[in-house]
Amino acid sequence: LPNLTLPMQLHIQRLVADQRQDWVLVIQQEGPAIRWSMMDLLGIPQARQKLQDGEWHADGLLPPNPEARELFAALLFALTPNAELQANYPAAQQHGAQRVLPEHWDVRYCAPNSFELSLPKGPKYQVTPLNGDAP
């Protein structure tokens, strides 16, 4: 697994057609696992997963959320440090401010933790760091 600087808080905007949803994602180390907790702007949990030994596991009583799991996996790819990219994702391609895992994810960076993430069958996500300020 890549080395992430944790804990991390991100503002996620999900963009589909003319609809937009806003979420807050908290990524934190918990023993040998990384916990991913996503909530809406009112603080209501939307998805929670733990990543341990390269496997995703449901965390808590929330129903499975395949889209969130795909989003979390794509975010892990997007947040992987450049020096660790090839070891973790051998098929990945990096060109300047763009990083692609063919058939999976397309990331375009504005800044290190600020980027647009596109999935092949949609949706698009705009991701920016949260520095203690609500969006």
Q: PLM features: what roles do these ranges have?
A:
Residues 1-4, 26-27, 102-109:
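Short linear motifs in intrinsically disordered
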Residues 11-13, 44, 48, 55-135:
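Mature, soluble, non-transmembrane domains
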Residues 2-5, 29-32, 49:
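Edge/loop elements at the starts and ends of beta-strands within beta-rich repeat scaffolds
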Residues 16-43:
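Structural recognition of beta-strand segments within beta-rich domains
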Residues 1-23:
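N-terminal leader/targeting segments and the immediate start of mature chains
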